[in-house]
């Protein structure tokens, strides 16, 4: 049998080194002695990120039919309450999935001719 480095991993005589994950270097904004001036730019205005969002290469106009993100994340007080969270009215059943369906009247099943023949044959 041939021994490999994987076989010798448990022994201390092999020249096996455990893989260690490396860390990426941290970005430093200015010098470490800058103090509390790191939150504002030298001009006094709040600096904006160069790539704040969207496509920086080809800026395209937003179509008129596109909804804003506020429509999706609006506060619940401005939007209508959801159907699951409101109390059902008198004409609407709780848990019913059919909106506008008329309730069906229950009626007995018509007698099955094969059962009648079996019942009369036994007597």
From Swiss-Prot:
A motif (PIP-box) lies at residues 66-77. A motif (D-box) lies at residues 26-37. One of its GO terms (biological process) is regulation of cell cycle. Keywords: Cytoplasm, DNA damage, DNA repair, Nucleus. It is found in: Nucleus; Cytoplasm, Perinuclear region. Residues 113-123 have a biased composition (Acidic residues). GO terms for cellular component: nucleus; perinuclear region of cytoplasm. The keyword DNA repair applies. One of its GO terms (molecular function) is chromatin binding. Residues 1-123 are annotated as: Disordered. Its main location: nucleus. A motif (KEN box) lies at residues 83-85. It comes from the Eukaryota. It holds the Pfam family PAF. A motif (Initiation motif) lies at residues 93-105. Signal peptide: none annotated. PCNA-binding protein that acts as a regulator of DNA repair during DNA replication. Following DNA damage, the interaction with pcna is disrupted, facilitating the interaction between monoubiquitinated pcna and the translesion DNA synthesis DNA polymerase eta (polh) at stalled replisomes, facilitating the bypass of replication-fork-blocking lesions. Also acts as a regulator of centrosome number. Interacts with pcna. This is PCNA-associated factor.
